[in-house]
């Protein structure tokens, strides 16, 4: 079967980010500058949302818009999803995709773990991650895809513009 539901977390390490020497405008837009690739991945795997209900709370000196995010929705394919992030607490990026027989866990995003139905065990899946270890994870293949001839799998500007509507909903609550 296919995806029956999914969830994702885009918690950022505020204690580290506040120390970074970045322009204030970059930090004020940190969700767009650094967190959206997690959201992109979740919606790439689970499907594009047709409805999102979003909540936000808190705020930080360097990111006053919000520091805690929570929400849920349904995709164009009628798959339910939820998300959360708390930039004031410990956490990490992650995506979990559920099917009728498996829970696929991307935490860290570069690794795949699987939990099978009827088991509480979670096992790492061996994947060819040589390029991710040699270069920044995902960068080599993304660059290769960018320069490939013919149809590639990168999103178009029009698709990115549509994705930005989802990012705005998540950010604005």
Segments and roles (model prediction):
Residues 116-117, 127-129, 144-148:
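An anion-binding loop in the catalytic cleft
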Residues 26-32, 126-137:
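A short glycine-threonine-serine/GTX helix/turn-capping micro-motif
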Residues 106, 130-144, 155-158:
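Active-site loop of classical SDR/Rossmann-like NAD(P)-dependent oxidoreductases
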Residues 1-55:
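Predominantly a Rossmann-like dinucleotide-binding segment in NAD(P)-dependent oxidoreductases
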Residues 33-111, 143-151:
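Contiguous beta-strand/loop segments that form the cofactor/metal-binding neighborhood of enzyme cores
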Residues 18-22, 123-125, 142:
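Short, basic/glycine-rich phosphate-binding loops at helix/coil junctions
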Residues 4, 91-96, 115-120, 124:
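A short, polar/proline- and glycine-enriched secondary-structure boundary/capping micro-motif
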Residues 144-173:
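C-terminal helix-rich "cap/oligomerization" subdomain common to oxidoreductases
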């Amino acid at each position: 079967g296919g995806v029956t539901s999914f969830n994702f977390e885009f918690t950022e390490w505020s204690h580290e980010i506040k120390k970074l020497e970045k322009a204030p405008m970059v930090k004020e837009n940190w969700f767009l500058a650094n967190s959206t690739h997690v959201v992109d991945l979740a919606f790439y795997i689970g499907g594009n949302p047709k409805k999102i209900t979003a909540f936000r709370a808190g705020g930080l000196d360097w990111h006053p818009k919000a520091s805690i995010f929570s929400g849920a929705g349904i995709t164009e394919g009628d798959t339910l999803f939820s998300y959360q992030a708390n930039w004031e607490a410990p956490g990490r990026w992650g995506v979990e995709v559920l099917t009728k027989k498996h829970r696929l866990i991307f935490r860290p995003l570069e690794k795949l773990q699987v939990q099978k139905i009827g088991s509480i065990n979670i096992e790492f899946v061996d994947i060819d991650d040589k390029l991710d270890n040699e270069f920044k994870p995902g960068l080599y293949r993304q660059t290769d895809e960018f320069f490939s001839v013919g149809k590639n799998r990168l999103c178009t500007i029009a698709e990115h513009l549509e994705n930005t509507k989802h990012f705005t909903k998540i950010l604005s609550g």
